[in-house]
Amino acid sequence: MTNIRKTHPLMKIINNAFIDLPTPSNISSWWNFGSLLGLCLIMQILTGLFLAMHYTPDTSTAFSSVAHICRDVNYGWFIRYLHANGASMFFICLYAHIGRGLYYGSYMFQETWNIGVLLLLTVMATAFVGYVLPWGQMSFWGATVITNLLSAIPYIGTTLVEWIWGGFSVDKATLTRFFAFHFILPFIITALVAVHLLFLHETGSNNPTGIPSNMDMIPFHPYYTIKDILGALLLILTLLTLTLFTPDLLGDPDNYTPANPLSTPAHIKPEWYFLFAYAILRSIPNKLGGVLALLLSILILIFIPMLQTSKQRSMMFRPFSQLLFWTLIADLLTLTWIGGQPVEHPYIIVGQLASILYFLLILVLMPTISLIENKLLKW
């Protein structure tokens, strides 16, 4: 008799995705981040659900309800900080996952890659609307500044901003709808994740060499289930350490002050995971130009498969491309640092140079060096 997991309609899907899935035998720990992102998503949905049971999306009570969760609800402080720091872990895993894709040429699976970019945008939107909910100073002013960017769109900009606000400023209507968005988006993300996996399993996983590994596959379980469990334990350990020892390390102290439309904080800045994009936005002295650069800094990922000029898929055997890749990582870290600094000399010029380098590396230098590497292969 055939095993039920191979015949039952539902079990069969799970079996083909997580148990008997043929997987390359040589994928490294950089391939762990996919499952870690799944774990982060489940964790965020669960902690978020319990927070939503006690949170009130109203301007007069939102801040107090978060304080109530932290003070009066059993382990409320723990759930709240798990959720806040869980978002940081989510983005660390996301950026590592994207970096892996760039390094090893996983973007050549175009459908999987494009769904991935869409997922990145959706997660960023979710994090943004979520940050507004505690209704602290940085929540309010962050929402005001970022939604205001849409007013740079010619002709319809102002109307669009007021439509999103539900009034003439960020107010009760804005908070209520942002809570609604923050609740629905993770479920949209879950659906997109299923599509992401569907497309991935059409082609099978890439591997560090970038060479097809169809002749050397092993079952996902037990080899990679055990490897993923190790990754998950390390992720949980990091998250718990952050949550229990320094829960506010990555947060902004300004968000412990209730939102006040009459008092602007000295330095308005987003959470650390948006700082690189914020630095690119600020580096252009024109509003529309800044907004376009901000959008392009993320959407440029869509064009990466078209910019592939190398004859090799992976960067594993391409030392010059590796050098440029790590330069790009250093540049992104520089932009992240600049995004958190005030707009004054020398940060302005450093931010502008780092922004130029970011686009130059992706659009010009990396495709060019790949062509040179192709020539070197012929020697």
Curated annotation (Swiss-Prot):
The keyword Iron applies. Heme b b566 binds at H97, H196. CDD domains: cytochrome_b_C, Cytochrome_b_N. A ubiquinone binds at H201. Keywords: Electron transport, Heme, Iron, Membrane, Metal-binding, Mitochondrion, Mitochondrion inner membrane, Respiratory chain, Transmembrane, Transmembrane helix, Transport, Ubiquinone. One of its GO terms (biological process) is mitochondrial electron transport, ubiquinol to cytochrome c. The keyword Heme applies. The chain crosses the membrane at residues 33-53, 77-98, 113-133, 178-198, 226-246, 288-308, 320-340, 347-367. It is found in: Mitochondrion inner membrane. Disulfide bonds: none annotated. GO terms for molecular function: metal ion binding; ubiquinol-cytochrome-c reductase activity. InterPro entries: Cyt_b/b6_C, Cyt_b/b6_C_sf, Cyt_b/b6_N, Cytb/b6-like_sf, Cytochrome_b, Cytochrome_b_C_euk/bac, Cytochrome_b_N_euk/bac, Di-haem_cyt_TM. It is a multi-pass membrane protein. GO terms for cellular component: mitochondrial inner membrane; respiratory chain complex III. Component of the ubiquinol-cytochrome c reductase complex (complex III or cytochrome b-c1 complex) that is part of the mitochondrial respiratory chain. The b-c1 complex mediates electron transfer from ubiquinol to cytochrome c. Contributes to the generation of a proton gradient across the mitochondrial membrane that is then used for ATP synthesis. Heme 1 (or BL or b562) is low-potential and absorbs at about 562 nm, and heme 2 (or BH or b566) is high-potential and absorbs at about 566 nm. The cytochrome bc1 complex contains 11 subunits: 3 respiratory subunits (MT-CYB, CYC1 and UQCRFS1), 2 core proteins (UQCRC1 and UQCRC2) and 6 low-molecular weight proteins (UQCRH/QCR6, UQCRB/QCR7, UQCRQ/QCR8, UQCR10/QCR9, UQCR11/QCR10 and a cleavage product of UQCRFS1). This cytochrome bc1 complex then forms a dimer. This is Cytochrome b. It comes from Grampus griseus (Risso's dolphin). The gene is MT-CYB.
